[in-house]
């Protein structure tokens, strides 16, 4: 009875690429997200069962999966990091489904720049699960050493600037100016803790395009379920709700790519 997923394909033959971007230069609270990709991959290799009870099948039978890591990424400036992520993402775009593993949320901007260069961004909705809106123009308002337009708190503003539609799920911590920007531009925000939890189907119906890019910042999940993050916020999505939401999105939309970011492994 084997456990763990296998990554035994070459990158040139893979139709699933796990792109690891260990970066946390602009993290505004606790550090550690640079260790996130390695921890996730380690768990995938040695901890998870090969039988998936949600689908009743072995995950992605017939898929050829490969790992790719951007080495020494944490030495880069935010601008250089985004360029490196974009270049690597472009290599496999169109060949494989790419799951980007952060690292802090700023790594997502590189993936979105690659997508926007290849497809019409206005036909794609970036669906973000996140406690925060990440709509700041830069990080100068809260950082003593600001990192500019490519900080982790700016990723959805960069998505907007690139022409993507955006949808925010699990929001419960934001600046007044961020929410004003969202309302001014008609961005769809599903706040948590301000009323009843929305049905997953209602969120899917609110996605205005057939194609989505999924960005999962794990601080969007209730820290009672996901404590291993640098910016935990009380409340958030419950684990099984999150699984159901993702399942509904994959069943009803074309997912152009996805990322999981802001995992900061705890020293158990």
Could you describe each region identified by the protein language model?
Residues 1-268:
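Conserved alpha-helical scaffold segments that buttress catalytic/binding sites
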């Amino acid at each position: 009875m084997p456990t763990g997923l296998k990554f035994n394909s070459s990158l040139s033959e893979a139709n699933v690429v796990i792109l690891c971007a260990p970066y946390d230069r602009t993290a505004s609270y606790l550090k550690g997200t640079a260790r996130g990709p390695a921890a996730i991959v380690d768990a995938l290799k040695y901890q998870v069962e090969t039988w998936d009870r949600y689908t009743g099948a072995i995950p992605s039978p017939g898929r050829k999966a490969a790992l790719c890591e951007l080495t020494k990424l944490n030495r880069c400036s935010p601008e250089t990091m985004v360029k490196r992520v974009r270049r690597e993402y472009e290599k496999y775009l169109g060949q494989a489904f790419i799951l980007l593993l952060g690292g802090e949320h700023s790594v997502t901007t590189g993936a979105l720049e690659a997508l926007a260069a290849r497809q019409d961004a206005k036909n794609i909705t970036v669906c973000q699960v996140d406690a925060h809106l990440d709509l700041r123009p830069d990080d100068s308002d809260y950082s003593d050493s600001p990192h500019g337009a490519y900080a982790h708190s700016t990723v959805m503003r960069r998505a907007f600037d690139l022409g993507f539609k955006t949808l925010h799920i699990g929001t419960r911590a934001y600046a007044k100016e961020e929410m004003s920007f969202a309302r001014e531009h008609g961005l769809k925000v599903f706040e948590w803790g301000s009323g009843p939890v929305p049905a997953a189907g209602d969120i899917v119906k609110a996605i205005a395009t057939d194609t989505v890019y999924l960005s999962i910042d794990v601080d969007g999940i209730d820290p009672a379920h996901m404590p291993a993050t640098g910016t935990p916020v009380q409340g958030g999505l419950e684990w099984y709700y999150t699984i159901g939401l993702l399942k509904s999105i994959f069943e009803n939309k074309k997912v152009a790519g996805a990322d999981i970011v802001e995992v900061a492994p705890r020293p158990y």
